[in-house]
Amino acid sequence: MTLDLPRRFPWPTLLSVGIHGAVVAGLLYTSVHQVIELPAPAQPITVTMVSPADLEPPQAVQPPPEPVVEPEPEPEPEPIPEPPKEAPVVIEKPKPKPKPKPKPKPVKKVEEQPKREVKPAAPRPASPFENSAPVRPTSSTASATSKPAVSVPTGPRALSRNQPQYPARAQALRIEGRVKVKFDVTSAGRVENVQILSAQPANMFEREVKNAMRKWRYEAGKPGSGLVVNIIFRLNGTAQIE
């Protein structure tokens, strides 16, 4: 024979049941004691007509304006009297002294000297020893009056000498020039050892002179050294060889 023991409920379940029961009891209590307020009966509405002039606020009374006090005019300053102008002092210029008249120079009287009478010389009697033949000049006098013969050096004869070309820069600037050149002539008649001795103006005509002299030709078989020529450039575009 077995006995049935009552089952034990877990404590979380009991706690939940207690909380719910408390909430239900509270709701019941508040619903019983709640007072229901009825709305008040409607009352009639009264309307009063008011004019807009009554609603305007009263204007503030402005105080009367204060009288404007005009400032007293300032006294005008008394004019300062100007000092009397002094009369300009006139300085009298001294009168120029009259220049003394130059005294006339005394004219020296030229005393005329008495002319001396020149008596003609009496003719001298011819001496028998004088020679009436004309005097011949001595040999020393003749040698002094005669000019010695100057020997003209014979150099190479030029066959063709082309004129140098006028530089375009000098022609544009309208500049004339002069170049002095020293050179040698070989036995074949060619020019070599060209040296510029002077050039006016410098660095203007030298290159054209050297280029032209390379084409010069002289007579073969007659060499020469230290020959000097002057080349003058004119504004008309020509060159003169001296």
Curated annotation (Swiss-Prot):
Annotated region (7 X 2 AA approximate tandem repeats of E-P) at 70-83
Q: Where primarily located?
A: membrane
PROSITE patterns for the chain: TONB_CTD
Where is the stretch described as 7 X 2 AA approximate tandem repeats of K-P?
Answer: 93-106
Compartmental location: Cell inner membrane
The residues exposed to the Periplasmic compartment are 33-242
Q: Where is this region: Disordered?
A: 55-166
Bias class Acidic residues marks the residues at: 69-79
Write one Pfam family the protein is assigned to.
TonB_N
Composition-biased stretches, type Low complexity, lie in 132-153
Each sequence repeat, start to end: 70-71, 72-73, 74-75, 76-77, 78-79, 80-81, 82-83, 93-94, 95-96, 97-98, 99-100, 101-102, 103-104, 105-106
Where does this protein have compositionally biased stretches of type Basic residues? 96-107
Question: How does the protein's chain sit in the membrane according to the entry?
Answer: Single-pass membrane protein
Biased composition of type Basic and acidic residues is found at 108-119
Question: What does the UniProt keyword field contain?
Answer: Bacteriocin transport, Cell inner membrane, Cell membrane, Membrane, Protein transport, Repeat, Signal-anchor, Transmembrane, Transmembrane helix, Transport
Segments crossing the lipid bilayer: 1-32
What InterPro entries does its record include? TonB (IPR003538), TonB-dependent_transducer (IPR051045), TonB/TolA_C (IPR006260), TonB_C (IPR037682), TonB_pro-rich (IPR049924)
Specify the TonB C-terminal domain's residue ranges.
151-242
Its BP terms in the Gene Ontology are: bacteriocin transport; protein transport; siderophore transport; transmembrane transport
Which ranges form a coiled coil? none
Q: Which family does it belong to?
A: Belongs to the TonB family.
Q: What is known about its subunit structure? A: Homodimer. Forms a complex with the accessory proteins ExbB and ExbD.
User: Per its database record, what is this protein's job?
Assistant: Interacts with outer membrane receptor proteins that carry out high-affinity binding and energy dependent uptake into the periplasmic space of specific substrates such as cobalamin, and various iron compounds (such as iron dicitrate, enterochelin, aerobactin, etc.). In the absence of TonB these receptors bind their substrates but do not carry out active transport. TonB also interacts with some colicins and is involved in the energy-dependent, irreversible steps of bacteriophages phi 80 and T1 infection.
Record-given protein name: Protein TonB
